Amino acid sequence: MLSVVPRPVVVRAPSKVNLHLAVGDLRDDGYHELNTVFQALSLSDTVSVAPAETLSVTVRGEDARVVPTDSSNLVWQAAEMLAAESGRRPDVEIAIDKGIPVAGGMAGGSADAAATLVGLNALWQLDLSREELDGFAAKLGSDVPFSLHGGTAVGTGRGERLLPVLSRSTFHWVLALAKVGLSTPTVFRELDRLRADGNPPRLGGPEDLMHALTTGDAATLAPLLGNDLQSAALSLNPGLRRTLRAGVAAGALAGIVSGSGPTCAFLCAEADAAVRVSAELAGAGVCRTVRVASGPVPGARIINDAAEGSH
């Protein structure tokens, strides 16, 4: 019998923007109750998994130096989790190519974890169902299940309980990446502090926004975007106000802080408008860099041939 070394499995996973993010009270488990509408965007990370002598993580791309390559990285935890489940050692090399901003509120770490689950499921020929992968994803982090599924979805609980949403058409976004990241726990704590002082108002339900998604009309969707964490992100980084104003002044239909920030996401009427807005924002000096993206797109998907087995 000829034993063929499995080829690396390469997986692409999308970033996300929260079109609606309503943050409830702090729960007994230390998390906040969330009601959110996610949309997966074309700005993505690529993760390659390959057999190795021991578990290792490498990262390249913008801000790669600040991404941990030890057990604090979700991809490491994903590998150990699947290895324990399948009764094997997690002897794989995980290579991450970052396209999603680090600490930008766009679920880059969650995307990498989802990609690792998908990649190792193929590499190790585990034949886990999507539902089984969902269970592992929810244990890894609140945004990991959505990174698996992609598209547009309502998330409840910590954001891990998902219900797909019909979203007609493609929406066009400009993403303004900030010079310095924001820690998600810090932003939630700041929101708790602001609320203890009596501010700010809370978002209602996302029903109108979900209806707007079914129309496929960006102009209808734009005024319905909302994020309870935005006030906290602006409190921690007041310069984001300039970024939001500049994007709308450049022609965006609306601007919003993405998740816990500090990335600002601008919804545009069409692809050409997104290119124009990105050019103006890039020259305005209000952010580190800009990216153009579209959504919804699929969740974590293998983009090369699946691993070959032993023959």
UniProtKB/Swiss-Prot annotation:
Q: InterPro entries of this UniProt entry?
A: GHMP_kinase_C_dom (IPR013750), GHMP_kinase_C_sf (IPR036554), GHMP_kinase_N_dom (IPR006204), IspE (IPR004424), Ribosomal_Su5_D2-typ_SF (IPR020568), Ribsml_uS5_D2-typ_fold_subgr (IPR014721)
Which GO BP terms, alphabetically? isopentenyl diphosphate biosynthetic process, methylerythritol 4-phosphate pathway; terpenoid biosynthetic process
Question: What Enzyme Commission number(s) does the record list for this chain?
Answer: 2.7.1.148
Provide the binding site for ATP: 101-111
Q: Where is the active site?
A: 16, 143
Pathway the protein takes part in: Isoprenoid biosynthesis; isopentenyl diphosphate biosynthesis via DXP pathway; isopentenyl diphosphate from 1-deoxy-D-xylulose 5-phosphate: step 3/6
GO terms (molecular function) for this protein are: 4-(cytidine 5'-diphospho)-2-C-methyl-D-erythritol kinase activity; ATP binding
NCBIfam families, A to Z: ispE, PRK03188.1
Query: Could you say which protein family the record assigns here?
Result: Belongs to the GHMP kinase family. IspE subfamily.
Role noted for this protein: Catalyzes the phosphorylation of the position 2 hydroxy group of 4-diphosphocytidyl-2C-methyl-D-erythritol.
**What's this protein's name?**
4-diphosphocytidyl-2-C-methyl-D-erythritol kinase
